[in-house]
């Protein structure tokens, strides 16, 4: 009879420690909703994609309700380039004419969304892909941007770029209650019936607020919020975040992410996390370990 080789004691002890450390967090979050904004390198690297899918499935299996909102900017840019269409950006936002919006819907609502659904389902989950147009989930409002000039501001038409006007969570609630994992593409529909591309961070934040989520998790390509010395700031209050924005410590592309998280907290979400999606099993490490791996934001 072939005998199984015994696990090395130190390795077995580490496994036991990880499981016991996770137990109180699993107990605390059971039955709660956690909204995860999925983007950055975690969507590009094959190993990280599978790691993320396993994390989401595990959350569901232990009784937590994950809701995934995803981006897809690089994928949109790649397809536009292949089609010979140049992307124009104004203050970080892609100018989106009707033809570009067709590509955005094709990439976000089709290619990217269905790839994520397939990844989760292959890991044993039951994911269902949605865009904000399904079940009238996301109502959008066209963004109108002004650019300061010497005399009067210039009004810039970004085309089919929107913000969240309202969210009707009925279809998401139905899926969660049916033990499915919703995967949402950030496309909304306006009062004019047109489709609008919406920043995925904003959609995730509003979704967390409307669903009365326990947590909002934003996956990024950085460790989290960094101090002036480059060290990770592991925990911040809203007041502390305001001060860091004011003194320039938080700057650039991190500001809209942080503001989105702050709005979610003010809207009733218990905590928000900005974490490094380049780390294997980042979601589990942030949720189920005492130390975490990113920046935890709290209302206090």
UniProtKB/Swiss-Prot annotation:
Alphabetized UniProt keyword annotations: Amino-acid biosynthesis, Arginine biosynthesis, ATP-binding, Cytoplasm, Kinase, Nucleotide-binding, Transferase
Localization (cell): Cytoplasm
Q: Output this protein's name.
A: Acetylglutamate kinase
Report the enzyme's class at the first EC level: transferase
Q: Which reaction is the catalytic activity of this chain?
A: N-acetyl-L-glutamate + ATP = N-acetyl-L-glutamyl 5-phosphate + ADP
> What are the transmembrane regions?
none
Q: Which pathway or pathways does this protein act in?
A: Amino-acid biosynthesis; L-arginine biosynthesis; N(2)-acetyl-L-ornithine from L-glutamate: step 2/4
What exactly does this protein do?
Answer: Catalyzes the ATP-dependent phosphorylation of N-acetyl-L-glutamate.
Q: Which SUPFAM superfamilies does the record associate with it? A: Carbamate kinase-like
Mention one GO biological process in which this protein takes part, according to its record: L-arginine biosynthetic process
Q: Which species is listed as the source?
A: Methylococcus capsulatus (strain ATCC 33009 / NCIMB 11132 / Bath)
**This enzyme's EC code(s):** 2.7.2.8
The positions annotated as site (Transition state stabilizer) read: 37, 257
Q: Which CDD domains match?
A: AAK_NAGK-C
* Residue sites binding substrate per the record: 72-73, 94, 197
InterPro entries per UniProt: AceGlu_kinase-like_sf, AcgluKinase_fam, ArgB, Asp/Glu/Uridylate_kinase, Glu/AcGlu_kinase, NAGK-C
Report the superkingdom from the record: Bacteria
GO CC annotations, alphabetized: cytoplasm
Question: Recorded GO terms, molecular function?
Answer: acetylglutamate kinase activity; ATP binding
Family label: Belongs to the acetylglutamate kinase family. ArgB subfamily.
